Amino acid sequence: LNKIMKKITKLMLLSGVVALSSTFYMCAEKTAAEPTLKDSFKDCFLMGTALNVHQVSGRDSMGQATALKHFNSIVAENAMKSANIHPEENRYYWDDADAFVKLGEDNGMFIIGHCLVWHSQCSPWFLVDENGNDVDAETLKSRLRDHIHTIVGRYKGRVHGWDVVNEAIVEDGSYRNSGFYRILGEEFIPLAFQYAHEADPDAELYYNDYGMNVPGRRNTVVKMVNSMKERGIRIDAIGMQSHMGMDYPDLNEFEESLEAFAGTGCKVMITEWDMSALPTVNQGANVSDTTAYQKQLNPYPDGLPEDIDTKWNNRMADVMRLFMKHSDVITRVTAWGVSDGDSWKNDWPVRGRKEY
């Protein structure tokens, strides 16, 4: 327990933990003696972050420097998604992905490829014929194999692990009715893993999803993973995306999922991790009352009040204790962005909203 508390204390000193507030940048400039995230957790798990193209290229030099100092694993936020890397059937765009992999290699980092199959940000041509109708099963299998073999093959021996399939299960445990599912059924998932393993037999392969604390989704993921293992299809880890807030998910429920996933024999990875200090978006809010709506969703435009900051830190400490309790099965914790300024939730669902 003392060891855990010392590590958590170190982390808290970094002002913002893995959400990495803007003060993190100032801390990085003050002294080289303070503990880094990767050093503080070196006996527990890899500490990772998502990089955008500006950080990879060095245009955001401070963001890149912070990432290299505090993390030992990186994932491309968007550069390897289908719509970006394979925008047309016979054309690939490699510049951003190549630069990302080189940055990781040059700095001895554990490199994650994200993601090979995802219904969102899928290239518009991928699932349809010249008339805009769904392609047949054999055509999609051929396209899927070519896409995965080309990308994974290009980075064979360089990218250490791949998010092969992303977000294929919905909360009630049914399969998402994506184009991949409509055309190939459940089989598109094991096929994707099979193709990835063919392209690089040494790479780790992951299934990644959000809301993994939800029992319906949890149960189906466990069944799916066990089925693939029984068929001899390689899958190394289950990624729990972990977009958290001050009161969600319930940590007991989250732990139940973590233990269930570990029970498959897979490793568990905390992926796309962030923890918002802002109120949960209320789908029933009166959006016609623009002023009240914006105030409700963006209550701290000038910074977090001290009591909210303290509550956030306490919540973060509880989350980190949970991760460390299960460091025997958790092999990586990846923050979704280097700083609050990089959050995918800034300006959503109202313009000017600041994410903390």
What are these regions (language model features)?
Residues 1-33:
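Bacterial Sec-dependent N-terminal signal peptides
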Residues 31-73, 77:
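Boundary/entry segment of secreted carbohydrate-active catalytic domains
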Residues 69, 73-87, 96-213, 279-280:
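Substrate-binding cleft and catalytic face of glycoside hydrolase catalytic domains
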Residues 154, 163, 168-186, 195, ...:
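Aromatic-rich peripheral "rim/lid" segments of glycoside hydrolase catalytic domains that contact
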